[in-house]
Amino acid sequence: MSNWQQAAAEITNALPHRIHEVVMVDQSPLARTPRSTPILYLGLYDRVRELFAGRPEALSQGLTASAFSFNSGSGRCERCSGTGFEKIEMQFLSDLYVRCAECEGKRFQPHVLKIKLHGKSIHDLLELTVHEAIEFFAEIGELKTLSEPLDILDEVGLGYLRLGQPLNTLSGGESQRLKLVRHLSETGNRS
C-alpha cells in the first residue's frame, strides 16, 4: 500500500460519517497539445456545438455541430487547423507561436463566426471566462447542463479561466483543480 493510499484509508476510517471518498489528484499536465480546453475536458463542448447548430441561421446553411468544432470539421480555419495560431520552429530556440493571419486567432471560418447564440459567436463564447459563462448559460436556459458543472470550477477558484484556453497553458495547481472538478462533476458529489 502506498503512502497516499494509507493516508486515505486513515482519513476515511477516522471520519467515516463525514468522508465517503478520498481521491488522489496529481499535478501532472492534462494535455501537451493546445487543442484541449477546459470546456472540452469537462465534456461540455458537445452541448455548446449542438446549441449553435440548432440556430436558424446554421440550419439554413446546412451547418451541423461538427462545423463548430475547432479540432475537426468543415468550419475550422484551414490555415491553422483550428488552433488560432501558427507554429514557427526556431532551430535552437523554443518554438514561436503567432496569431493566425487568416482567422486572426478566432479558430473558425467567417461563415461559422456569423452564427450567433444570443449575440455571441462560437469564438466569443470560447473567450468567456468560466464566471462569465456561468451567467451566460443560466440566462439562455442551460443552467443544469452547462452552468452547474462550470459552477464547480468557479467554486475551486478557477472562475478566471477562459473556456477555450489551451490546457497546456495551465499551471500544475490549476491542472490539479480541473481534474478534481471533473471527478466531482462525474460523480455528482460536491461536498
For the regions a language model picked out, list residue spans one by one:
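Conserved phosphate-binding elements of NTP-dependent enzyme cores
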Residues: 1-191
